[in-house]
Amino acid sequence: MTAKTIDLNADLGESFGHYTMGNDSAMLDIVTSANVACGFHGGDPEVMAETFRIAREKGVSVGSHPGFPDLWGFGRRVMPFTPAQIERIVAYQIGAAQALATYSGHRMTYMKTHGALGNLTERDPAVAEAIVNAVKAVDANLPIMAIALSHLERIGRERGLTVFSEIFADRAYTEDGHLVSRKEPGAVLHDADFAAARAVRMVQNGAIETISGKMLPTRIDTICVHGDNAESVEVARKVRAGFEAAGIAVRALT
């Protein structure tokens, strides 16, 4: 059955100090949910507060976006943390986002992991379990966005969390439904028209479309457009326009 609504999310608030990442203000005119970096892979208190403030003014839902403490690698390198350490770095970042969202007059309403930490939840159940432990310890009522078909999606639901299943508009998928490594050619989709058409097909069919065109059925609640690419704003605009043209309403989940 064709989905009647979909959430459109983006990873934002990733600038820090003198370094600027993406065009957050433009993206916040398009997306319905913003995953805000918490200072470990990107972001700092000034950027976080400003992102929450603009999101509040534009009516965009916000979530914490914890990652590995790796500013120079942008959180895209796997780091050798134990599950117990992962629990603490996730709890720390959720708390920072909650505090600065409240400070900025907004409310943080979900959590989504970033980069290498998020990718590990596809393949490593111990990492997924650690993230669920952290969320339940900090706020058992906090929903999570989890990569569709991942261990985090499964374990989160098994342990009673509200889980929003996420696919990606601008990333290629392997034949088993995992994200193609960014080290591989074609892992990131830069053609906005192609990305938008594929996003509509996936949501209409309730399935991930792999690099060969195979469709893998899955629940889909939200779709991500990354905010740090040169084409991000164009891709986001065309994805949203594609949904609306197909009769799929774009609305926040929280």
Swiss-Prot record:
GO biological process, one term: carbohydrate metabolic process
Pfam family membership, one: LamB_YcsF
EC supergroup of this enzyme: hydrolase
Catalytic activity: 5-oxo-L-proline + ATP + 2 H2O = L-glutamate + ADP + phosphate + H(+)
KW Nucleotide-binding (keyword) present: yes
Keyword entries, A-Z: ATP-binding, Hydrolase, Nucleotide-binding
EC number: 3.5.2.9
CDD domains documented for this protein: LamB_YcsF_like
Keyword Hydrolase attributed: yes
Cross-referenced InterPro entries: Glyco_hydro/deAcase_b/a-brl, LamB/YcsF/PxpA-like
Recorded GO MF terms: 5-oxoprolinase (ATP-hydrolyzing) activity; ATP binding
Superkingdom in the source lineage: Bacteria
Primary role: Catalyzes the cleavage of 5-oxoproline to form L-glutamate coupled to the hydrolysis of ATP to ADP and inorganic phosphate.
HAMAP family: PxpA
Family to which this protein belongs: Belongs to the LamB/PxpA family.
Record text on subunit structure and interactions: Forms a complex composed of PxpA, PxpB and PxpC.
Name of this protein: 5-oxoprolinase subunit A
Taxonomic lineage: Bacteria, Pseudomonadati, Pseudomonadota, Alphaproteobacteria, Acetobacterales
